[in-house]
Amino acid sequence: MNRNQNLREFLPQDGFAGTLIGRAWIPTAVSGKTAGPSPVWLTESGVLELSSIAPTCAELLDNGFSTKGVDASKLANVGSYDAIMANTLASKRDANLPYFLSPVDLQAIKACGVTFVVSMIERVIEERAAGDAKKADEIRDKIKTRIGADISSIQPGSLQAEELKNALKAEGLWSQYLEVGIGPYAEVFTKAPVLSSVGPGAEVGILAISSWNNPEPETVLLVDSRAKVVGATLGNDVNLRDIEGRSALLLGKAKDNNASCAIGPFI
């Protein structure tokens, strides 16, 4: 950890004013029980263990957790936010102290692709460049000149989108990425297996064979089993542009790798 790093920068601008749910590893030395992960509630006075209410974040959110009616004095305080975050970010964590984990545990982890005009065009560029970063600038200029202005005002799935699709096909510029960008169906894929996401302080995984990649900041929505959005956090989708650019069928190889899904710090 950078000694000058402000630990409070990992909190929302309003600090602890809202309801902040996280997940932490609680060692036996602190809990007096078998060491393990637990949902936690972050407050100004301390980080409160919620395992007595629900054993996982998935169950906690699915049950519609609310701080109203919860007697905080009956919950175990496992330490201050600052102390736990400092241990989370430490180059060598103290195993006898708690540290934060990804707040996502048993939920399925899905991702949506080609959600913005810019990202859609970039996917087309990757496909045309076949994973070659040197060709990307030339192709980017060509595509933006030809279709950039038209795409931005198109309503996906509309008659106008269908007309544009036909025009692009005629010009040899049609792409599977434009299909999901302006077509009626969104791209939704499984990003990572259950319990595989990493949280604050962890290093993300980059496939060793990739030489053209970048972080991909995302808004992460927490959705219960009734399809209701119950919370939000941040994520890094970790994009291997040279791998996916070779073929969309390599999406799994580009996206689903060890520690390639970073989520957090808190819901």
Model regions and ranges:
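Active-site microenvironments in enzyme catalytic cores
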Residues: N2-I26, L42, G69-I267
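Short, solvent-exposed loop/turn segments that connect beta-strands within catalytic domains
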Residues: A29-G36, K228
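N-terminal cap/recognition module
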Residues: A35-V78
